[in-house]
Regions:
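Short hydrophobic/aromatic beta-strand micro-patches
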Residues: 142-144
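Catalytic core of pol beta-like nucleotidyltransferases
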Residues: 2-121, 131-136, 146-210
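Short, solvent-exposed beta-strand edge segments and adjacent coil->beta transition regions
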Residues: 138-140
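Regulatory nucleotide-sensing modules
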Residues: 125-129
Length: 210
């Protein structure tokens, strides 16, 4: 991420590029793009104008819904037309840009483990899917440990999603449940371990050897 930020000018630009590359068929308002990238609205709008100018994205009209809660009354629903943005598949450098942006290490693996460790006693962390450029994988992250705080992991994952530009598919399991599922050849576990994946942390294997 740091190298790409230097090449492309800012972390926000890289996050927004990934956001559109990972979601090529969706249309987003500048407000939603800013929210998902955890970026300032003004900065986001500036980047979107640059993207449009070079032909990376194109405008599309969308209907935006706003819900306003009112005391002792039904919520007020407002719908308005606004400008949305979507990836322009005719962008001439789409493939090489995608290879560069997506195939570059998304988040340092040691940093990922360090962040997730805030949630409790980690035993196993497996990366698949988006982290190893395997789009067909069932999961992106399998997190195993003892007394894990799911709310903490949820916050960490949300932060990673904003950096990567894609919603992550992940599962959290207590060690005992993981061992049981593995012993009965559970489909979820096999869908991860029988296909390309990368172990970022494996204390379970270390414990076997001791």
């Amino acid at each position: 991420m740091e190298i790409l930020s230097k090449l492309f000018g800012s972390p926000t630009r890289v996050k927004l590029m990934r956001f559109f590359l990972f979601n090529p068929d969706k249309i987003y308002s500048s407000k939603e793009a800013a929210s998902r990238a955890h970026a300032l609205p003004r900065e986001t709008e500036k980047e979107l104008r640059i993207f449009e100018k070079v032909g990376f994205i194109k405008r599309r009209g969308i209907i935006e819904t706003e819900l306003t809660t009112r005391r002792n009354k039904k919520p007020l629903v407002r719908r308005r037309k606004t400008v949305g943005w979507t990836l322009d598949r005719l962008f001439p450098y789409l493939l090489p840009l995608k290879n560069l942006i997506i195939n570059t290490t998304l988040i340092d693996h040691r940093e990922m483990v360090r962040r997730l460790a805030r949630a409790g006693s980690l035993k196993l962390v497996i990366a698949a899917g988006v982290f190893i450029q395997e789009e067909e994988s069932r999961l992106d992250l399998l997190i195993v440990g003892d007394h894990l705080k799911k709310t903490v992991i949820g916050r960490v994952v949300k932060a990673m999603e904003s950096e990567i530009g894609k919603e992550l598919r992940y599962v959290i399991l207590e060690t005992s449940e993981f061992k049981y599922r593995a012993s009965i050849c559970d489909k979820l576990i096999r869908d991860v371990t029988d296909y390309p994946h990368q172990k970022l942390l494996d204390k379970l294997e270390q414990e076997k050897e001791e």
